[in-house]
């Protein structure tokens, strides 16, 4: 890699990168990928600045190098590449002369035309993830962020790309060339996988001077300096220490060990109450897609263009009306919102050129649905100190809900096969070393089993929706942007297919903190009549919007088409995790791999081929009231994947708590089955900790029900 860097980059850039690594005490002979990354970043910063000047009229112009007009002012001040002291001197000088706010971190450039600092990012990962990391680190609206990737993607604050398209294309071409050159030399995979998340200043922070003396004075007894204390903490093994402390505890602490027998455990108590309701961010088994095969229309790949093309495939639209109202909402507003979407889509079609994005008119119905101006006013605490009865407002305890059959049906459906292919082979990642040939074979077998699975569709749908929503939240903070809910797949014959599930309308999204909420209205197509399970759709207002002709064995039949509308909300951190659902594939693959490994160690040879190709053998899938359910290896793969996907879709504090606490009971039961004669104390407290997590979440309630089935059959 070092040889490649020295051949590929300008010697001046290489020299600057060497200095930077030396400044931070890093060895470029060892950290070769970092060396390449620093050179790439420097080159992008220089290319960003190249040829851009400001003329005497204050206008930004482009001038090639051989132009004799040398009196022009450079548009960009380059800060990256200078040593830290000089860089901060330049930043301070700019702030003093322009009145710009001083940034907390060293930026890369200053734009004299737009009067703002610029942070340039070059990533080997997805631009959205890297943008989010940069934004979270900088936490400043005054520094403009512009991210480039090696695949030609880019992302910038408020979708303001600063430079003209030609200048940006030059940068993207150079990055693509670097990637190709690395790939030709077999360096790309290592380089791509070596990228870490954005580092914070603390990782590089050296304590010196007064702060260092204070740190040394503040140490516990017996420690002479901070390094010794750090070394002790890093190497601290708590177990023996805790056991010693337990023996010194008061005799009043009752920790009497009780034997754990087959008759000891009782079933977990599930809550009573009305049935639980659907709380996923998008419809699962009830979703309906409007699809186009082999899309080749103008603007193919632009979500709004794809959505309009999909909408044109359906001819059964009719005057919408409410069939299942939301009990607490102003239902006519949901109806008006759908009519507004239809009207504004029609307006777009009447235009000469379809825009890339659509911002909805801020009508009264959308303002209501998106909670505009509904948030309570925030008041500074200092202004309230004198109020004698100041207290936190009372919040109601969540209403207990009982388990309902629909969530088991949802899970069963997620394990089923569809007639489409949702992932290509490379979704799970490439081999890194030759020894991974067996792993490749396992991965290919696994992919073949799950590529058609409905749970895989949910992954791709979730990734798309969360990415689009986060993008819009960053780029159009004040707008009510219309976001089509789209997925891409292939038919069994290999033809490409674009699917539209419905639309999202995003509310105002000034998301400063990870947990700040953006409201959105989702409108999703379905053929499911909500009156069959009204409790499942408690949070929805459902409209009937058309009639769909369906072909069946007995001919054509007409079914009413519904639109499920609800107000919902999410946050940056939830969208980030939603965008990262693909590792669900990896998690379930690893679980299958451990089964193959166990089988191989018994037979003392690799059993991958036999494991996947022996269709007659069945494997345990899970527990049900009937006992241990078994199925083919493909069914096991799909069940494990569906569990992983549902953990992501229904992620909640209730699930975290239940998983952590029930695992303790599971380990004790497992020890009993292995004849290890386990003992417990305060088993009642453990049950209490488990049961306080069973409130109203459908996925947690289903897991608790499965756990009870396991207890019944495990202790027979």
Curated annotation (Swiss-Prot):
This protein's record includes keyword Phosphoprotein: yes
Binding site for Mn(2+) 1: 41, 108, 119-120
BP GO terms, sorted: cap snatching; DNA-templated transcription; symbiont-mediated suppression of host gene expression; symbiont-mediated suppression of host mRNA transcription via inhibition of RNA polymerase II activity; viral RNA genome replication; viral translational frameshifting
Renumbered ranges of motif Nuclear localization signal 1 (NLS1): 124-139
Cofactor(s) the record lists: Mn(2+)
Main subcellular location: host cell
Binding site for Mn(2+) 2: 80, 108
GO molecular function annotation: endonuclease activity; metal ion binding; RNA binding
Record bears the keyword Metal-binding: yes
HAMAP family: INFV_PA (MF_04063)
Protein name as annotated: Polymerase acidic protein
Organism the protein comes from: Influenza A virus (strain A/Korea/426/1968 H2N2)
Record lineage: Viruses, Riboviria, Orthornavirae, Negarnaviricota, Polyploviricotina
């Amino acid at each position: 890699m070092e040889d490649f860097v020295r051949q590929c980059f300008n010697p001046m850039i290489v020299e600057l990168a060497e200095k930077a690594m030396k400044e931070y005490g890093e060895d470029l002979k060892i950290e070769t990928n970092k060396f390449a990354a620093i050179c790439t970043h420097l080159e992008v910063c220089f290319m960003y600045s190249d040829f851009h000047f400001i003329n005497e009229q204050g206008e930004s112009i482009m001038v090639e190098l051989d132009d004799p007009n040398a009196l022009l002012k450079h548009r960009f001040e380059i800060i990256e590449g200078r040593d830290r002291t000089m860089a901060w001197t330049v930043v301070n000088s700019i702030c003093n002369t322009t009145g710009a706010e001083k940034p907390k971190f060293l930026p890369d450039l200053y734009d004299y035309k737009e009067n703002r600092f610029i942070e340039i990012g070059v990533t080997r990962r997805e631009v959205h993830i890297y943008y989010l990391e940069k934004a979270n680190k900088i936490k400043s609206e005054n520094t403009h962020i512009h991210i480039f990737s090696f695949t030609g993607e880019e992302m910038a604050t408020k979708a303001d790309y600063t430079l003209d398209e030609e200048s940006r294309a030059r940068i993207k071409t150079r990055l693509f060339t670097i990637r190709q050159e690395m790939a030709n030399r077999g360096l790309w995979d290592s380089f791509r996988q070596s990228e870490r998340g954005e580092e914070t200043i603390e990782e590089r922070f050296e304590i010196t001077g007064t702060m260092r003396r204070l740190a040394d004075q503040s140490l516990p007894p017996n420690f002479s300096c901070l390094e010794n204390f750090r070394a002790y903490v890093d190497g601290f093994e708590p177990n023996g220490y805790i056991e010693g402390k337990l023996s010194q505890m008061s005799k009043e602490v009752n920790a009497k060990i009780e034997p754990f027998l087959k008759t000891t455990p009782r079933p977990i108590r599930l809550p009573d109450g009305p049935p639980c309701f659907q709380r996923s961010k998008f419809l699962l088994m009830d979703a309906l897609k409007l699809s186009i095969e082999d899309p080749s229309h103008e603007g193919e790949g632009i979500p709004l263009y794809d959505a309009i093309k999909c909408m044109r495939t359906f001819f059964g639209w009719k005057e919408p009306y409410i069939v299942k109202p939301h009990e607490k909402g102003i239902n006519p507003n949901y109806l008006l919102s759908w009519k507004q979407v239809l009207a504004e889509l029609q307006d777009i079609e009447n235009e000469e050129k379809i825009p890339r994005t659509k911002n909805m008119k801020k009508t009264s119905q959308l303002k209501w649905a998106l909670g505009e101006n509904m948030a309570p006013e925030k008041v500074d605490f200092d202004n309230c100190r004198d109020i004698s009865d100041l207290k936190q407002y009372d919040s109601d305890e969540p209403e207990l809900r009982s388990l309902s059959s629909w969530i088991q049906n949802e899970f069963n459906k997620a394990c089923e096969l569809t007639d489409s292919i949702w992932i290509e082979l490379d979704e799970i990642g490439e081999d890194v070393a030759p020894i991974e040939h067996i792993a490749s074979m396992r991965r290919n077998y696994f992919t073949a089993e799950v590529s058609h699975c409905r749970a895989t569709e949910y992954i791709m749908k979730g990734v798309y929706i969360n990415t689009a929503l986060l993008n819009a939240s960053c780029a159009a903070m004040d707008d009510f942007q219309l976001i089509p809910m789209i997925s891409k797949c292939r038919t069994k014959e290999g033809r490409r297919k674009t699917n539209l599930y419905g639309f999202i309308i995003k509310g105002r999204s000034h998301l400063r903190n990870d947990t700040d909420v953006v409201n959105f209205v989702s409108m999703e197509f379905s053929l499911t009549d909500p009156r069959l399970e009204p409790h499942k759709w408690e949070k929805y207002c459902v409209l009937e919007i058309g009639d769909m002709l369906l072909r069946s064995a007995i001919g054509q039949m007409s079914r009413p088409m519904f639109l499920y509308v609800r107000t919902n909300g999410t946050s940056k951190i939830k969208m980030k995790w939603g965008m990262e659902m693909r590792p669900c594939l990896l998690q379930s693959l690893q679980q299958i791999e451990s089964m193959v490994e166990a089988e191989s160690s018994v037979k003392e040879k690799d059993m991958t081929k036999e494991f996947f190709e022996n269709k007659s053998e069945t494997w345990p899938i899970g527990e049900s009231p009937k006992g241990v359910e078994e199925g083919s290896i493909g069914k096991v793969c799909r069940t494990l994947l569906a569990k992983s996907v549902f953990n992501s879709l229904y992620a909640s504090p209730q699930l975290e708590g239940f998983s952590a606490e029930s695992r303790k009971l599971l380990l004790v039961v497992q020890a009993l089955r292995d004849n290890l004669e386990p003992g417990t104390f305060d088993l009642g407290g453990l049950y209490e900790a488990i049961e306080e997590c069973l409130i109203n979440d459908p996925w947690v309630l289903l897991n608790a029900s499965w756990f009870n089935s396991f207890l019944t059959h495990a202790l027979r």
